Curated annotation (Swiss-Prot):
Role noted for this protein: This enzyme is involved in nucleotide metabolism: it produces dUMP, the immediate precursor of thymidine nucleotides and it decreases the intracellular concentration of dUTP so that uracil cannot be incorporated into DNA.
GO molecular function, one term: magnesium ion binding
Compositional bias (Gly residues): 173-184
Similarity comment: family membership: Belongs to the dUTPase family.
SUPFAM superfamilies: dUTPase-like (SSF51283)
Protein keywords: Hydrolase, Magnesium, Metal-binding, Nucleotide metabolism
Organism: Bartonella henselae (strain ATCC 49882 / DSM 28221 / CCUG 30454 / Houston 1) (Rochalimaea henselae)
Names of the cofactor(s): Mg(2+)
Protein name, per record: Deoxyuridine 5'-triphosphate nucleotidohydrolase
Polar residues: compositionally biased ranges: 1-16
Length: 184
């Protein structure tokens, strides 16, 4: 039986971590993907290495089309794919580190979330944070997706605080944020 709120929180975290580890299948789960017409002929998302966490996503532009991203400009790039995720999972859309380092290209909504009940095309919102125009062509690896479990919670409202002595029942952080714990 937990003695404090901190003990209860720690027990909840340990139980959650244990359930995630024990629920990992011995075989990889299958991600069903539907290709749209403009996604035909492109490689399906795949892991670049045995230890990769993300599956590469490619631009599903037409052969004749090139999207030029000027510095500061953003564009929504189609992948030509619809994900059919299992309930209890999401697909996170993340930038590719090489594009960010070499060209300043990143995903604007990071990580983007594809919910398990979404059945539209997966698109990637890219922005050019670099100094030069960047050309996006058909088949380019533009982002990566990580499939992750989702923990849904029950939400309950707390009563308003009655006085200063009950404001911080766990820890001493209070309402501090955005660098309030230090800058080193």
């Amino acid at each position: 039986m937990p003695h404090t709120q901190t003990d209860a929180h720690q027990n909840n975290q340990e139980n959650f971590s244990s359930s995630l580890i024990s629920s990992r299948p011995s075989q990889p789960m299958t991600l069903s993907i539907q290709r749209l017409d403009h996604g035909q002929g492109l490689e399906l998302p795949h892991y670049a290495t045995a230890g990769s966490a993300g599956l590469d996503l490619r631009a599903a532009l037409s052969e004749e089309e090139t999207v030029i991203l000027a510095p500061g400009q953003r564009a929504l790039i189609p992948t030509g794919l619809i994900f059919h995720l299992s309930p209890g999972f999401e697909a996170q859309i993340r930038p590719r580190s090489g594009l960010a380092l070499k060209h300043g290209i990143t995903c604007l909504n990071t990580p983007g979330t594809i919910d398990s009940d979404y059945r539209g095309e997966v698109k990637v919102l890219l922005i050019n944070c670099g100094q030069e125009d960047f050309a996006i062509k058909r088949g380019m690896r533009i982002a990566q997706t990580v499939i992750a479990p989702v923990l849904q919670v029950n939400v309950c409202a707390l009563e308003p605080q009655q006085n200063e002595s009950t404001k911080n029942t766990v820890g001493n952080r209070g309402a501090g944020g955005f660098g309030s714990t230090g800058h080193d």
